[in-house]
Amino acid sequence: MARKYFGTDGIRGLVGEGVITPQFFLQLGWAVGKVLAQQNGDKSGGLVLIGKDTRISGYMFESALEAGLISAGVDVGLLGPMPTPAIAYLTRTFQASAGIVISASHNPYTDNGIKLFNTDGTKLPDDVELAIEDQLDRAMTTASKLGKARRIADAEGRYIEFCKGSLPWGFNLRGLNIVVDCANGATYEVAPKVFGELGANVIPIANKPDGLNINLDCGSTKLNQLQKHVLETGADMGIAFDGDGDRVMFVDEKGEVLDGDQLLFIIASHKHKNGGCSGVVGTLMSNFGFELGLKNQGIPFERAKVGDRYVIEAMKNNGWQVGGESSGHIVCSDVTTTGDGIIAALQVLLALKAEKQSLHQLKLRMQKMPQVMINVRVTNKVDLDSHEQVQAAIASAEKRLDGKGRVLLRASGTEPVIRVMVEGQEHQLVASLAQELADIVGEAVA
């Protein structure tokens, strides 16, 4: 059954348009509450935690969700601004019926959306999302017994202790100078405290959210300021999160970027060396050099569809504990249930301290293959699989790569774009082929 509202990572869009309205969030809160009550045998929907990032519209949507849930007889715990993975963790440890995150991740403040977690801190299964969608199309009715709402005062401290507790006893970051870019988002309080309490000298940037500056020229998708600060301060590294804290990117002491593939490689290699990595899940977008680097160590590798829910599903199916995406979504399931930027960063730092090498030296252990990705904005939906001109262009590009690269066209699950990716041994050829393909795709969807 096709979904009407939920995408690959919840619901997301421009505030005030489509379903990103207070009216819809009120109805959504009620629908979630009704489904939870049904799961509990038509008893109370239990407790639902609500957290958010720092965008200004979060307060409006928090109130709407709260009202909808309470009207369905559900108790609500309000967490305030917290990273998405923190909300997953707290949902699990509070034994809540569900957790809701109000966020649009790495998007600008003009967007917002929601993600939902199950009672065990994992993304909601498809059948539950479909049940919620079914309720959304029904008229709201107030429960005979209303729920109550309360603020969770110690949420931040609980999550900080969880992050520190994920490391071996006695581990510290003393002697490291780290620039931390909080994207003016949900990690602005938590991230500097975690690294600082572990002994690092922390230089925080983009840590003054005003509701409008989340992800604005900062964070994991805009690394220029982080690179500049690392070089100017002579720091050992920089760490950047996205607006809701489930993605992470690093910058080494030379100002060079380490993406999700390179960070996963460092984590997996260290775990493998210590007998704790039976395999790694990447995605269709993972760099081929990453795959080769793992195979050279005898580490099995599998590609899943793009989206952390598919990565986690493949990890479970294989019984593996490490997986993630080039974008910086990294899952270490021996520690947490979902992508967690801070936990992933700590795993990289654990490897760095154990290897007694600089981040740049660790970066050089994996040779990335040149990869170019171009986003083509979509105005009309077109079946590219049956589009003769597009398919002919793909075949031509693959022939020119001569079996030493990859071509991938993929519709984004969160934006109205087609991602055109070409990978190969020679950057000039890769860039040329990617642009040629993007131009042809652009004509097809115009």
From Swiss-Prot:
Domain of life of the native organism: Bacteria
Post-translational modification, as annotated: Activated by phosphorylation.
Record SUPFAM superfamilies: Phosphoglucomutase, C-terminal domain, Phosphoglucomutase, first 3 domains
GO CC, any one term: cytosol
Listed cofactors: Mg(2+)
Cofactor: record remark: Binds 1 Mg(2+) ion per subunit.
Documented EC number(s): 5.4.2.10
Sorted UniProt keywords: Isomerase, Magnesium, Metal-binding, Phosphoprotein
EC class: isomerase
InterPro entries: A-D-PHexomutase_a/b/a-I (IPR005844), A-D-PHexomutase_a/b/a-I/II/III (IPR016055), A-D-PHexomutase_a/b/a-II (IPR005845), A-D-PHexomutase_a/b/a-III (IPR005846), A-D-PHexomutase_C (IPR005843), A-D-PHexomutase_C_sf (IPR036900), A-D-PHexomutase_CS (IPR016066), Alpha-D-phosphohexomutase_SF (IPR005841)
CDD domains (UniProt xref): GlmM (cd05802)
GO biological process: carbohydrate metabolic process; peptidoglycan biosynthetic process; UDP-N-acetylglucosamine biosynthetic process
Reaction(s) catalysed by this chain's protein: alpha-D-glucosamine 1-phosphate = D-glucosamine 6-phosphate
Residues modified as Phosphoserine: S105
Signal peptide: none
GO molecular function: magnesium ion binding; phosphoglucosamine mutase activity; phosphomannomutase activity
Binding residues for Mg(2+): S105, D242, D244, D246
Positions of the catalytic residues: S105 (phosphoserine intermediate)
Functional description taken from the UniProt entry: Catalyzes the conversion of glucosamine-6-phosphate to glucosamine-1-phosphate.
Family: Belongs to the phosphohexose mutase family.
Name of protein: Phosphoglucosamine mutase
Source species: Saccharophagus degradans (strain 2-40 / ATCC 43961 / DSM 17024)
Species classification: Bacteria, Pseudomonadati, Pseudomonadota, Gammaproteobacteria, Cellvibrionales
